[in-house]
Amino acid sequence: GKKPILVLREPSMGPVFGMKGGATGGGYSQVVPMEDINLHFTGDFHAITAANDLLCAAIDNHIYHGNELGIETVAFNRSLDVNDRALRHVSLEHRSEKFNITAASEIMALFCLADSLDDLKEMLGNIVIGYDKNQRLILAKELHIEGALVTLLKDAFYPNLVQTLEHTPAIIHGGPFANIAHGCNSIVATKLGLSLGDYVITEAGFGSDLGAEKFLDIKCRKASIFPECIVLVATIKALKYNAGISKEDILIENVDAVREGICNLEAHVSNLKKYGVPLVVCLNAYDTDTSLEQQVVIDWCKKENISVAVST
């Protein structure tokens, strides 16, 4: 009788059209409508792109009209939600520039760490846009641009509600990359989920040494929340790959390789135990797994007194 709800990140069109593909799941573990979520969705990324590039335009316009702030080095780049190699390095009239993908924009990270529009406005104003000849930090609010930026983002700041194929509600909002940002969905979406569901499930991009630590040390601190449980997802294929098995042989039963690869799982478990939160290892089962391979993981978890579940 308990109500679960998911709170997830939005896909970026760059990976969707690249090697990684979409970010709505697969099989029966999927949020829908897949094509709408992966492509444009509600336009949140476009609003963030527009705000990002408005700030860039204001910087260059300020320099053009006399540079009263004495900007010597610009430290804020343009963005676009497409993998466009030709725009990674471009030449402007008086300096070089580059485009980041929108998910890597500082505005995307701030968008997801703000708990209100006022909070977002303050953080936008504190973006470091450059340095003067004395290496003084120059902030966006010195251009008096933060009001315009937050106005562009006011509608995008509302979270988006969709559902899984099994009709579980899913709030999808924001999408900072985890390698250069904190890799978590927005705080406002997470708090909305907490107000509506009995169990709120979210994801933190990448493993315990990156996604989990950023979620716990950055997002949770900013939002004044903390998880009741951590789920560490493992697969037999990944464990064998960590043991050095080639992709060509990874679907062949290899119990010894699973045992050898468990050292990687052990390292992630060790990282997460430091937070003192109940931990569950979830073995994401595939039909290519064998019962003997799965049993290696189950037995190891029991030996280490770690709760384990097999997802089918």
Task: Show the residue positions of the predicted features.
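Flexible phosphate-sensing "switch/lid" loops adjacent to ATP/NTP-binding sites
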Residues: 1-312
